[in-house]
């Protein structure tokens, strides 16, 4: 492709709306343009990267035995009501009615549609196992689209669905997809780590996320510094070490704490450590009041709480509603004396001796609080967020936390959808059984952003060779006929050798060409000038390493191929 013909509107300045590097560089390099919040158009260079990633995905998925299909973006409400997710998916789902008043949504995911697709076709155990995948647009009404392609309202996703006779078969399908995903990301030239994850609204049994480690990532990953344990913080656990109760238990006492609502204020006012505090977090769980308790030096993990409660909606109680639901006040709510409120506590709360909690009276707290003696809870369980320095649940190592970008997610759905939607098969004995399912997703457009977050410098993008829009860029410098002639010859020779090449034939200064080449991140840059031609060489630079080479004009194709073989 000649750059004089290429639609590539680069920008010199960083757009104000772009917060993260990938968004900044995709706008500056002319890969994308914004239509409205969270909705983007892909320009030629950006779309070539998309097609490269899709090509890798298709090849690996086909090699794994999966078959490609294409399902609609518009879904009927009936299917989602069958699965029970029409309401549970919440405001992320964009719903609408047609002119006849029938309800539809724009598909945020395709479990319901794929289950409907196979339930009338799979009749016998002989039809299983089966794995179907698609690469399709998804739509989710994100409350705050941000970070460019990392959190957008419309995005391209590869989603696959496995269908097996039993859980043993699902385990095999899951491992095949786990391996396939690892291979996809390796072929894309990315460093990705698989971590245990929460299943969320997808439901099901086990789940793993594939994360690109990056400071701009919205997800926090907890991992052990000694073993291979890694999990999304939403799912992560730490070893529970029971505290020794060697302190004399004191009588309960109510004390005045004027205006002291926060943990750090109470620590200072009462001269007590935060681990003595019982932090109470008030929610309405599907309209029912729930009080969650964690130690004052811990943070509540809402995902763990939601999973235990198994509710559709968990809403923090606003200040003015405390008297109505808790007969208490914001900042002073506590578990003692509460009626008609479900109390759930982290297991570390049970070990507190002579602690502090709200007295359900404005400007007052209880001291010398002892769980079990002073209040009862429905359940003690792990509902705290892990933090750095916690002990690994599997070894003697300690937990570290880093940010990451989720680029893939796999789930063992089990029979969640097949049972609710009647997707069954007949086994060898003629008995009807629910199909056991798995779901596997890769965020194609998000993968583009993650690749840039992991591969860039102060000058621009550094594309991994496998997903670069072009492999080589030729920069003819100067106006001599011999320079342009040799650049044209090399351009045509590279094309004849199936090497994807850009020829910067624009009438621009050398500095502009160099800057644009670095910005768009083509792996190998070839510079042709009169001085180098006088020496019989072409100057080559590898974008990723910055290393320079001189290659012979006569053996240019052979030398370029050799250089490309060593480019990552």
Swiss-Prot record:
Q: Which GO terms describe its biological process?
A: prolyl-tRNA aminoacylation
User: Where found?
Assistant: Cytoplasm
What's in the keyword line of the UniProt record?
Answer: Aminoacyl-tRNA synthetase, ATP-binding, Cytoplasm, Ligase, Nucleotide-binding, Protein biosynthesis
Keyword RNA-binding listed? The answer is no
Q: Which reaction does it catalyse?
A: tRNA(Pro) + L-proline + ATP = L-prolyl-tRNA(Pro) + AMP + diphosphate
Annotated family = Belongs to the class-II aminoacyl-tRNA synthetase family. ProS type 1 subfamily.
Q: What is known of its domains?
A: Consists of three domains: the N-terminal catalytic domain, the editing domain and the C-terminal anticodon-binding domain.
Alphabetized NCBIfam families for the sequence: PRK09194.1, proS_fam_II
Q: What does this protein do?
A: Catalyzes the attachment of proline to tRNA(Pro) in a two-step reaction: proline is first activated by ATP to form Pro-AMP and then transferred to the acceptor end of tRNA(Pro). As ProRS can inadvertently accommodate and process non-cognate amino acids such as alanine and cysteine, to avoid such errors it has two additional distinct editing activities against alanine. One activity is designated as 'pretransfer' editing and involves the tRNA(Pro)-independent hydrolysis of activated Ala-AMP.
This chain's protein is named: Proline--tRNA ligase
